[in-house]
Design a protein with these regions (language model features):
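His/Asp/Glu-enriched, well-ordered alpha-helical/loop segment
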Residues: 89-90, 96-108, 256, 297, ...
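Gram-negative bacterial Sec-dependent N-terminal signal peptides
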Residues: 1-21
Length: 447
C-alpha cells in the first residue's frame, strides 16, 4: 500500500511539470499591465509560444479565447536571488545543489547541472505568478546578509564546511514550466562582500577588497598567458584553471558580478571597485542603499532588494528601512524586488513584497516593473520575457484582481504559451487530508 501511495505521488508530481504543446490563444477583456504600460479592455494574442500583439482589438477568428473580463493580466513574474529548482529540503544536504563547500572549485561552480524540473517548489511558485527565475548559488562559508527559510543550509555538512573561496559560483535563468527548464546558464557570477566577504578573507573588509583586486590581476595574467600557464612557465596562481577561466568574462566586464552587500560604506567601496577595475556589478541586498541612492544611480548599477528589510539584524543593516525601494527608485536606480532572500519555498512572496513596497512609497507601476521587466533587463533578457510585447515569451498570468493584493489569485498561468496546472503539492495534500466535516477521517486513514 505504501508503494502505491509513493507511486501515486510521483505521478502527481510529474503531472505538475509534464511537457505540453504551446497553443495559439487570445486573452481578452482584461486590464493588461504590460510591464511598461496599461491597456484597458485589452487583448493579448499568443502564437507558437510568443506574444504577437497586445491591443484592444478582437481575438483572431477561430483562436482559443481566455476570458479576462473583470480581471488583471500581467506578464509572468521574474524571481531573482532565488533557489528554485536547486534545493528541496533546506536542512537535508543531499537535496541542496545551490552551494559547493570545496575550495578547489568556487567561481567555476555551475549550479545549472543540478537543477530539478520536478522540484515541488516550482508549482508553488507558479501559483504566485512566477514564470521565470534567476537561480543564484549560495556562498557556503557565511549566512551573513541573508535570511533563509526552512534553515536552508543548516546541517549542510558533516562537521561543517571547508573554507570556501571568495566566489559562490555562477547563476542561471530558468522557466517554471516543462521538463527542460534551463533558459541560460552562467548569466552572472556571485560573491559576498561586507560581513560575509570579510569572513571569507580572514575577518576584515580591507582584506577582501585587496584579495578581490589581486584575484582579478591573476585572472588577467592568466588570460594573457594561457600557454605559459600550461607550461608552468609563470608564477603560481591562487585559483584553479577552471576558476580562472570562469572569471575571465567578469574581469573583462562581460559577465555581471552579483555582489551581496548591505552597509552604505560597503556599497560605496563596491562602486569604487567597479569603477577602478571595469567590473560590471549588480548589488544584492543594499539594505542601506537609500543612504547612497544618488551614487548608485550615477554609477548605473541595478539593485536586487528585499523591500521589507527594516531591522538592524547585524551591524551592516543599522539603517535598514522599508522606504528603501521607494528611495532608490526615486533616485533613478533600476530595482528588482526579491521574494524571501535565497528562497525556493517562498519565491512566491515576490508579489507580497512588491505590495509592501507600494505601501511604503514605491509607485504601483514601478512595483510591477520591479518584478517583471526590470529583472529581465538587468540580466540581459530585455524584450525576451517579463513584458507583454510582440516577440516576447508567452508568459502571462490572469489575476482575479490586483496582483499585489494577497487575496487575488491566478485563474490562468501560461509559460511559453502553455497553460500550466493551477496545482501544487501543498494543495494536493490539503485536498487529500481535508476532513469534509467534523469527525470525518482523512481518506488515507481508511486504506
Amino acid at each position: 500500500m505504501r508503494i502505491k501511495t509513493l507511486l501515486a505521488g510521483a505521478v502527481a508530481a510529474f503531472a505538475l511539470t509534464g511537457p505540453a504543446l504551446a497553443q495559439d490563444v487570445a486573452i481578452t477583456g482584461g486590464q493588461v499591465l504590460t510591464g511598461t504600460s496599461v491597456v484597458e479592455n485589452g487583448t493579448v494574442v499568443i502564437r507558437n509560444g510568443k506574444v504577437v500583439s497586445v491591443g484592444t482589438g478582437a481575438a483572431p477568428a477561430g483562436m482559443r479565447v481566455i476570458d479576462a473580463r473583470g480581471k488583471v493580466v500581467t506578464p509572468g513574474f521574474v524571481a531573482v536571488d532565488s533557489g528554485l529548482g536547486g534545493t528541496e529540503v533546506g536542512s537535508v544536504r543531499g537535496s541542496n545543489d545551490l552551494s559547493n563547500s570545496a575550495n578547489t572549485l568556487t567561481a567555476a561552480f555551475d549550479l545549472s547541472y543540478g537543477l530539478d524540473p520536478w522540484s515541488f517548489t516550482l508549482p508553488v511558485a507558479r501559483l504566485g505568478g512566477v514564470t521565470r527565475a534567476v537561480v543564484t548559488p549560495r556562498h557556503a562559508g557565511s549566512r551573513a546578509g541573508h535570511s533563509h527559510d526552512d534553515s536552508d543550509f543548516a546541517g549542510a555538512g558533516d562537521g561543517g564546511y571547508q573554507t570556501p573561496g571568495l566566489f559562490a559560483g555562477q547563476a542561471a535563468v530558468i522557466k517554471l514550466g516543462g521538463t527542460d527548464i534551463l533558459v541560460k546558464s552562467k548569466v552572472a557570477m556571485t560573491a559576498p562582500f561586507g560581513e560575509a566577504g570579510a569572513a571569507v578573507a580572514g575577518g576584515a573588509r580591507g582584506a577582501e577588497f585587496v584579495l578581490f583586486k589581486e584575484t582579478l590581476a591573476e585572472v588577467r595574467a592568466f588570460a594573457r598567458n594561457k600557454a605559459a600557464y600550461d607550461r608552468a612557465d609563470m608564477r603560481a596562481l591562487s585559483l584553479s584553471r577552471a576558476d580562472l577561466e570562469a572569471l575571465i568574462p567578469v574581469a573583462e566586464g562581460r559577465m555581471p558580478l552579483i555582489v551581496t552587500v548591505n552597509r552604505a560604506s560597503d556599497i560605496q567601496q563596491v562602486l569604487r571597485l567597479s569603477r577602478e577595475e571595469g567590473v560590471k556589478v549588480i548589488l544584492d541586498g543594499a539594505a542601506e542603499g537609500w543612504l547612497v541612492a544618488n551614487e548608485i544611480a550615477a554609477a548605473n548599477v541595478p539593485v536586487l532588494l528585499h523591500p521589507i528589510t527594516n531591522l538592524p539584524s547585524n551591524f551592516e543593516m543599522r539603517a535598514a528601512r522599508m522606504q528603501n525601494a521607494a528611495a532608490l527608485n526615486a533616485a533613478g536606480v533600476v530595482i528588482a524586488i526579491k521574494g524571501n532572500e535565497g528562497s525556493a519555498h517562498r519565491a512566491r512572496d515576490i508579489r507580497y513584497n512588491a505590495g509592501n513596497a507600494v505601501s511604503h512609497g514605491l509607485p504601483f507601476a514601478a512595483a510591477i516593473q520591479a518584478i517583471t521587466v526590470n529583472p529581465a533587463r538587468i540580466f540581459g533578457f530585455d524584450g525576451q520575457f517579463g513584458e507583454l510585447k510582440a516577440g516576447a515569451a508567452g508568459d502571462v498570468v490572469v489575476w482575479s484582481g490586483d496582483p499585489l493584493e494577497p487575496f487575488s489569485q491566478p485563474s490562468a498561468v501560461l509559460i511559453d504559451g502553455v497553460e500550466q496546472p493551477l496545482q501544487g503539492r501543498n494543495l494536493l495534500l490539503r485536498d487529500r487530508y481535508r476532513t469534509g466535516g467534523e469527525g470525518a477521517m482523512p481518506p488515507a486513514y481508511g486504506r
